[in-house]
Amino acid sequence: MAEILKERSELDPQFQWDLTPMFESDAAWETALDSLDADIESLAAFAGKLTDAVTIGAYLDASTEVGRKVERLYCYASQRHDEDTRDDKAQSMYARVGSKYVKMAAALSFAQPEILSLPEETLTAIVNDPAVADYKFNLEDLLRGKPHTLTKAEEKLLASFGEVMSAPSEIYHNLEDADLLFDAVKDGSGETVEVTGSNFVPLEMSTDRTLRENAFHSYYKSYREHINTFAASYAGAIKAATAEAAARNYPSSRAMAMAGENVPAEVYDNLVATVRKHIPAMHRYVRLRKKMLGVDALHFYDVYAPLVGDLKKSYSYETAQEMVLKAVAPLGEDYQATVRKAYAERWIDVYPNRGKRGGAYSGGCYDSNPYILLNFSGTLDSVSTLAHEMGHTIHSWRSRQHQPPQYADYTLFVAEVASTVNENLLIEQLLANENDPQTRLYLLNQYLENFKGTVYRQTMFAEFEREAHAMVERGEALNAAALNALYKRLVTDYFGDDMVIDDEIQYEWARIPHFYRPFYVYKYATGYSTAVALSEGILKEGEPAVKRYKEFLSMGGSAYPLDELRHAGVDLATPAPVDAALEKFERILDDAEATLAKLQ
């Protein structure tokens, strides 16, 4: 019988986050919110005057301060809301501060076009003026985008097409969330099981192969029936991105998508080429999965099936805290001291309660502690989640300690690096101290699954996306037949001869929502590869690698992400980091195969 969740008031406060460093009370929050409108409205005084370095510097100081106030109000309300999403008061707080964010964005909208309308020689002089020295990197970045910024009238016209250009994404989400219906199926015992969009992956993780197979056929039958609509919506999304890229003087939609973080195309192409070089290792893993499952033919309804039974171990939260502390020991005493600080000062909301937001995240703002939301359940996965979120948290903490507010936030390109380094350090620490073959095999398989899902699978998606956009740019028809054929070819390449290429898998591209955020998925693969390279360096090289890594954690957004990673010792403009990561994958495969042999 499932455990009944307690109300938040029934839980021990020592396992709940302490938000009082942000605001002493909800009443203090209300007072601060009431004063915000005047702060936002004061920014309008700068409109039409951003023509010299002194005025621009004063504007940037003022807007940064207002931004800090809004961010602190938002973080408090958001976290209060997540404590119990049923709480009407917290819902109201969250909605009201959300509207202030919209108001602030509108109040600031004049600044960027006004600054960029200045002659280039004037802008160059302003960027190098001591009056804006604290914002030089931001202004240089703004200047970098000038060739792709249109006139005020053109920007207004392009903005008016915003809803039209986002329509394909809306069509996709409405189709997938509201219109797709799936036939109920029978499990291995003959019981009827409902299939939904949200339970499909859990069903595919079942140990009941009959259920997995039937759910697989039911699920993709609905996608097949709607595949022409999915293809039309995706083609529309690509055409919208291609049109905007052309309007903004970018050579391609990919160049536009990658320009924001100043990442060159060769990083993307290096990733695909290097993963392609290591595809034989993926084929080895497919053979290992087939062997461990003991099946004559491995189908795509077997790819999520558990290879090793769940560990029966349960961990107290206190044990989990110690496990994470041990795992990050290679990062030094000062890193561990911050972890202890997070534990002692109640940065973490540990246990589930009725109404609490599910999942986990790391949050907070420049003027608060970082905070972690967990729903700790005592599993090894829960321990890993604590390590993961602590990685984000200490990245945020060090960035905020070492950077001014305008440079404290790191980019999405590097966002998962620190969290994955911690996960890898945890699993390495567990493997180093585990002799039981069954437990070792469980841990090794978790490691392999992370590689498969985050490096190989996301790179396959990235290759699909690159080719789909290129087809539109070449003027080729992007219909269901073309997309299905492209996806099936890639799946065949990546999974190899030991995998049965089920007919339905050609429709899988249609269920990937990330494709409506162009050229985003590759960052999962580069981020994971970077984290593997860094964690390997930390464990093998020791202090020099740790020093570089901590400096990277302290950089926030003060440089472009590739430059930050180079500082840490990883150059994604070369194949080396992805090569190193996939060589690690091969060593884990060796270990898993040897461990399996001991059990047979």
Task: Indicate residue ranges for each PLM-predicted region.
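A well-structured
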Residues: 1-310, 595-600
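Catalytic zinc-binding patch centered on the HExxH motif and its immediate surroundings
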Residues: 313-315, 348-368
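C-terminal, non-catalytic "cap/extension" segments appended to globular domains
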Residues: 9-11, 20, 24, 111, ...
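Post-HExxH zinc-binding segment in Zn-dependent metallohydrolases
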Residues: 410-438, 447-449, 453, 527
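Short pre-active-site segment immediately N-terminal to the catalytic Zn-binding motif
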Residues: 313-315, 365-387
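Active-site recognition of the HExxH zinc-binding catalytic motif
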Residues: 249, 377-397, 419, 424, ...
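Long, K/E/R/D-enriched contiguous segments that form extended
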Residues: 292-330, 336, 370, 395, ...
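Conserved helix-loop functional segments at active or binding sites
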Residues: 326-337, 360-363, 392, 396-404, ...
